[in-house]
Amino acid sequence: MATVIRLTKMGRKKKPFYRIVVTDSRKKRDGGWIESLGYYNPLVEPALVKYDAQRLEYWKNVGAKMSERVAKLTSKK
């Protein structure tokens, strides 16, 4: 199973926030996920990003690929 770390959209119309999740690469964006690692809220100023760094590192070491957006968000800390 090829795993990826990516964002899944939550919230409501015009008020989105995103979860940082580990999922199978073949699933849809908002399909089921294996583990939730954190969240990203772009609506507050400054944008809020919180995630479990240990679990993120674990999944990267196991072989999960990160999406470009998640890589940018997690490198800012």
From Swiss-Prot:
Taxonomic source organism: Helicobacter hepaticus (strain ATCC 51449 / 3B1)
Keyword Ribosomal protein: yes
UniProt record similarity statement: Belongs to the bacterial ribosomal protein bS16 family.
GO biological process per UniProt: translation
Gene transcribed to yield this protein: rpsP
A Gene Ontology molecular function term of the record: structural constituent of ribosome
Name recorded for this polypeptide: Small ribosomal subunit protein bS16
PANTHER family named in the record: 30S RIBOSOMAL PROTEIN S16, SMALL RIBOSOMAL SUBUNIT PROTEIN BS16M
Keywords, sorted A to Z: Ribonucleoprotein, Ribosomal protein
InterPro entries listed in its UniProt record: Ribosomal_bS16, Ribosomal_bS16_dom_sf
GO cellular component: cytoplasm; small ribosomal subunit
A Pfam cross-reference name: Ribosomal_S16
